């Protein structure tokens, strides 16, 4: 009997691989499939509101009864009272990583936190939200630069003062905001089904 499917709406292959690993890969009781839908991103500071708006669009596009989730991640600087937050993707796209780091040059506090918010619609159409958070420091880029801001974020829990980009995926997934949020989703799915 085939495993039930859950749709992850993303066009990011790195994110898909990482999430598949966190959710159990081939050993999970469901199959993770990707739908790279082009969803409008609500602009705002409320991450839960942004994720739920994206989820509503995904449910509309895929049709009711199909389990689906979306994910949104923010990187917030302590000195900027939460900014760039959900806008980090656009800051990096517009300015590049080096200039994003440079924004904190005149501040002693380089503290930051990352938050991942997952909005999930189960097969009955009920909506669920899961969120993970990790504190860290903004540093000059170290490691690969092919996955967002991983190379400029050094989590406080890093054993060797590594950025996400320098860490082994398994180590990163244990302490990252995405790993924490998806661990909650995984627990929900494994305990209640899809």
Curated annotation (Swiss-Prot):
Residues bound to Mg(2+): 41
Class of enzymatic activity (EC top level): hydrolase
Residues in coiled coil: none
Catalytic activity annotation: ITP + H2O = IMP + diphosphate + H(+); dITP + H2O = dIMP + diphosphate + H(+); XTP + H2O = XMP + diphosphate + H(+)
Cofactor: Mg(2+); Mn(2+)
EC number: 3.6.1.66
A GO-annotated cellular component: nucleus
Family: Belongs to the HAM1 NTPase family.
Name of the protein described by the UniProt record: Inosine triphosphate pyrophosphatase
Gene of this entry: HAM1
